[in-house]
């Protein structure tokens, strides 16, 4: 069976050290590695001068130093047949990539991990949210939408993804524990950019 190629297009900054690539977001390590189990995967991201802690175990990674090189990498994939495009979040880089893909009638998936409305409001201020909203409306109207939370998409036809990094060994040989005293406390990322709900 021929494995289909999936091109992941992300705003993620990636550090290159010889043949190794590192990113700062564990999701952007897990996603391409997980998809590569069943598909051929190419990952297009932005270059970084800072080495981050998550090594991405993937052979086909393209790192762009500017928007023109980024879009060049997207256009270069058009020579390949039977391909799908997987945009991660809505940013200017992924939006311009989307426009090119849409013009050439490519199959596009958009994966929304957080509310861009809230992030843009926090980072750039309330006045700039309308720019994000226009990009959001254009992309979700013309893509297959996948979300981590139903509130992230107003589109009725979206696919809810339940990310879990717990695999089978976590669920084997469970022991009864005493809940009288807390022995482990984990607090995930809580920040205004991602929204606190």
Question: Can you describe what each PLM-predicted range is?
Answer:
Residues 7, 177-194:
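Conserved donor-binding/catalytic core segment of Leloir-type glycosyltransferases
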Residues 1-51:
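N-terminal subdomain of nucleotide-sugar transferases
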Residues 48-76, 87, 124:
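A short, charged, and often flexible helix/loop element on the N-terminal side
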Residues 125-183:
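Donor nucleotide-sugar binding/catalytic pocket of nucleotide-sugar-dependent glycosyltransferases
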Residues 9-19, 109-135, 154, 169, ...:
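Acceptor-binding helix/loop patch of EC 2.4 sugar-transfer enzymes
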Residues 2-11, 101-118, 146, 158-162:
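Active-site proximal beta-strand in glycosyltransferases
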Residues 85-117, 150-153:
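An aromatic- and histidine-rich active-site surface loop
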Residues 42-46, 111-112, 148:
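Short internal beta-strands
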